[in-house]
Amino acid sequence: MQKGFWAIYFVLLGVLAILLLVLHFKTISAYFYQFRYPATATSATEAIDASLEPKQEAVSKDSIFVTDRKRRRSELMPVATYDIQAKVAINARHPQSVKIGNFLDDLLTNDLVLVWGKLADDYYLKRIKFSHQFAYMTFKYEDPALNSDPGQEYIFTHVSSNHLIAANTNLDHALRQLQKGDIVRIKGYLVNITGSDNTSINTSTVRTDNWQQGEGNTGGSEFIYVTELQNGDRLFK
């Protein structure tokens, strides 16, 4: 009888431990990445407003040359300044979580799926399922009410797949720390890239290229050279 009691006790204890891990996964994950990738922050002076549209402005600026994790050099050509305030739907870190199969594997810090406007409200966000594979983002939803509020076109034009290149190690670490649900502000440049293998890749410069009637999210992605990150009330440069 006593052996049976202890067996049940340890089973229940194990189930409880698993539940606690699941419930606190974000907290545990956040501490893990903060420990593995320490970053220095200052206090932000402005609150983030994820209801706003991203801002960009065409720019004429010299090329930026960056060295990847294998010490190979790529050229970034800024085409616009960029400022986006949004909620993180997915953070896929390079190269641990993403394998593209070209020079980008060692150049990019991470891929962020970001939502803003109405989609930053959990009422809508919880009804949309996002996935990410091989640097491509897809999403779907089953609630037909979303077709009218906020509307299919609104959804497709208020989510973006962003490929990020950190301007320095501190920003690289801060970007890797980001978790699903974080409210962030990212500033930098939209850039066209010439890779170490001379492959050329252009950034998207409009949010509407995610929208094609009847075909789903088949549009382009933003390539962002990140010079500043705000995560909540913490500012990283």
Across the structure, where does each feature detected by a protein language model lie?
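OB-fold and OB-like single-stranded nucleic-acid-recognition modules
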Residues: 4-237
